[in-house]
Regions:
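Sequence signature of WD/YWTD-type beta-propeller architectures
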Residues: 2-3, 39-351
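Secretory targeting and sorting signals
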Residues: 2-42, 47-49
Length: 351
């Protein structure tokens, strides 16, 4: 069963969440063994040598905490509120809850600022989904957007910390998709980079701030990665729609783009590609019912944190965080102590 990534008329959060949080697949199809079995699953590694990202990442980068979303589950694997933003050390210790939005609300999709001092995220704690920002310890939580008739989702920082790019999806009758918007870090100066003729989801600035990569869906179930200048010009596609690529993220040195292919075609997997669309490389090799994705590089480019789907006793389907080397080797679980964790972002240690 596939769910469209495109929010059509009368957009609902549950429809968008089906792609963002559930990797575009009904959770009921997942009957894989839990994390213990996943750690020993037959996973063919990528190239033996480290990827270009790991080989050339700046030596000054220091890996900090991993931010992630946590959802509660109902029996059978159905999503239920609340969800909140947490952080954890790369070795699985020191889990810390940053948001407390209440039983009927949600906060998630965290993205670290480049200096490791702030996190931008989405939340519906005051009604519809808006963009929020907070300090790395969870203090200073502040709403940045509040326009009626829209859901604001999937925020990401510019490298200099001055701007935030995000998806704005209409909830009005007749709405056709999601705009791509950018604003200042204070929530002012909003302008549109791409209109809602398509659905633009999860954009990311390049490390030098000159380009933006974004997943776009032009109806049906087809999604591809597109590249544009940071001012919205020069739009061009870098992956084939047949990949149904989503959730892109740049390597710290800008040489590769990490992404996930869509599930239900034999399992979802993590790939990388060069910004010019060449050098496509598959890092994981799962087959249904195993799935992984929604991956993020460590600040030094040597590792990747990602979501892995598995079965948990008496709870239905669970999603765990796993870490692997940048070449796809060394896959191992990150023991978060919670059964449903996803949409992670690996931050840099603040100075």
């Amino acid at each position: 069963m596939k769910l469209s990534t495109r929010p059509h008329r009368g957009v609902t959060r549950s429809r968008i969440l089906a792609t963002f949080a559930a990797a575009g697949c009904a959770a009921a199809v997942l009957t894989a063994a839990g994390p213990a079995a996943a750690g020993t699953a037959a996973v063919r590694t990528g190239a033996a040598a480290a990827t270009a990202a790991a080989a050339t990442a700046r030596a000054t980068a220091v890996n900090g905490r991993i931010a992630f979303s946590q959802w509660d589950l109902l029996p059978g694997g159905n999503l239920a509120g609340p969800s909140n933003v947490y952080t954890i050390n790369p070795n699985g210790t020191g889990r810390r809850q940053l948001t407390h939005v209440g039983k009927k609300h949600a906060a998630g999709a965290p993205d670290w600022s480049r200096d490791g001092t702030k996190i931008v995220y989405e939340s519906n704690q005051t009604g519809n989904y808006r963009i929020w920002v907070m300090n790395a310890d969870g203090s200073g939580q502040r709403r940045l957007t509040n326009d009626p008739g829209f859901m604001d989702l999937q925020p990401a920082w510019s490298p200099d910390g001055r701007h935030i790019v995000f998806s704005r999806c209409t909830t009005q009758p007749g709405g056709t998709g999601c705009d791509l918007e950018v604003m200042t870090a204070r929530g002012t100066g909003m302008r549109r980079l791409a209109d809602d003729h398509w659905s633009w989801v999860h954009a990311e600035y390049s490390p030098d701030g000159r380009q933006i990569v974004v997943a776009a869906d032009r109806g049906g179930f087809l999604s591809a990665l597109w590249l544009m200048r940071s001012n919205g010009t020069g739009l061009h596609r870098i992956t084939k729609p047949s990949f149904e690529a989503f959730w892109p993220e740049w390597s710290p040195d800008g040489s590769r783009i990490l992404f996930t292919d869509n599930c239900c075609q034999g399992g979802s997997n993590v790939w990388t590609v060069r910004p010019d669309g060449t050098g496509l490389r598959k890092l994981t090799h799962f087959s249904m019912p195993l799935q992984d994705g929604f991956a993020s590089y460590s600040p030094d480019g040597r590792q990747i944190v990602m979501q892995f789907n598995g079965k948990c006793p008496a709870r239905g389907i669970c999603k765990y965080l796993y870490v692997m080397n940048a070449d796809g080797s060394g896959l191992h679980p990150l023991r978060t102590g919670v059964p449903f964790t996803f949409l992670s972002d690996w931050g840099r240690a603040s100075s």
